[in-house]
């Protein structure tokens, strides 16, 4: 049976380039999705063993079929990527870690998942076992809470006005679909930005539903505590707020000195670096990839090499 692939992995060539020198040990794909990145890496690294995680049951089910030829080298696990480091074995043997923290094309295009502005549902949960969906947020959050979401996560200047419109409409009838919400928010653009106001608002709601920024910070903090040895980490993000967080952590990890900037002379020992930043600038999709997959336009990848001396 030929499987119809529901998602194109972004920055596939660039991911393979980052991990090209891996030989043995374990590779952790924290956000397996539909297996595109892992499939390519499994083919090119025959001596690597894989731990593949995702919180989406549908994605895991599909990927188990897609990667069945590699079943002797791969362990599957359902988990949010912020929790996966606490659950896995072979931590000391990790040589590569990949986290692609975007929404898959399958999730965006699946009407029942409620991610798209054209959806008849209002859900947006990446983990369908989660209790809070977009429906609860839109219909129960206070005007102040909604304003905060649109301002902080969507960076929308008229966040208060959008929240006010939502509260007014739901006082008449509960908002039950993404289509309805789209009509309420409107189609306009946010000043000079190319992305529509509705897209930014939907993105903000999705971040709140899935606690995406908190999850990312938790994951990076767990890595910081773990201090992997001789391990490459690559993170693909699709939102400027996420990319900013990754950039800040990588910068922090690369520093030897952790003294207060106001101190004239180092007092910390100047030996706190966990490794080196591999990517001086975030890697973006090539022109060729953009032509094939327009959804890769927001993707940015940063990579870090852990070689901390304390763990040697």
Curated annotation (Swiss-Prot):
Subcellular location as annotated: Cytoplasm
Any one biological process term the GO annotation gives: rRNA base methylation
Pfam families, alphabetized: Methyltransf_5
GO molecular function, one term: rRNA (cytosine-N4-)-methyltransferase activity
Keyword Transmembrane helix: no
EC number of the protein: 2.1.1.199
Binding site for S-adenosyl-L-methionine: 35-37, 54, 81, 100, 107
Keywords: Cytoplasm, Methyltransferase, rRNA processing, S-adenosyl-L-methionine, Transferase
Keyword rRNA processing attached: yes
Main location: cytoplasm
Main enzyme class: transferase
Gene Ontology CC annotation, any one: cytoplasm
Enzymatic reactions: cytidine(1402) in 16S rRNA + S-adenosyl-L-methionine = N(4)-methylcytidine(1402) in 16S rRNA + S-adenosyl-L-homocysteine + H(+)
Family: Belongs to the methyltransferase superfamily. RsmH family.
Function comment: Specifically methylates the N4 position of cytidine in position 1402 (C1402) of 16S rRNA.
Official protein name in the record: Ribosomal RNA small subunit methyltransferase H
Species per Swiss-Prot/TrEMBL record: Campylobacter jejuni subsp. jejuni serotype O:2 (strain ATCC 700819 / NCTC 11168)
